[in-house]
Amino acid sequence: MNTVLIIDDDKELCALMKKCVEQENLSAVVAYGGLEGLRLLEENKDTCSLIILDVMMPDMDGFQVLQKIREKNNVPVLMLTAKSDEEDKVSGLRLGADDYLTKP
């Protein structure tokens, strides 16, 4: 089964995204920080088909997480964040994000 990895420190948003993913008959795993997200990616590397990644997290920001992901993995990454500056979007895309969406 394809797995979507959600990495975001907002627990309510994670629960909502997980529910939406599972309604599409996909599996979802949730990490509430960057380090946990990298660990879960390693555990699910054979089934992970998408990563939804926040930028602002306490232990490791999403840009750092994305750099680590791209060292070993080409799984598609969707950055979903409240950071709406054009500079942040460009940084995310240059680091290898497949898309960059801002939260309302």
Segments (PLM) and residue ranges:
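Two-component/phosphorelay signaling modules centered on CheY-like receiver
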Residues: 11-29
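Receiver (REC) domain active-site loop signature in two-component systems and cognate sites
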Residues: 55-57
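Acidic, metal-coordinating helix/loop segments flanking the phosphotransfer/catalytic sites
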Residues: 30-50
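Acidic catalytic/metal-coordinating carboxylates
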Residues: 33-36, 61-64, 69, 88
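Residue-level signal for the "D+5" position in two-component response regulator receiver
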Residues: 30, 59-60, 86, 94
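Conserved phosphotransfer cores of two-component systems
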Residues: 42-46, 68-75, 95
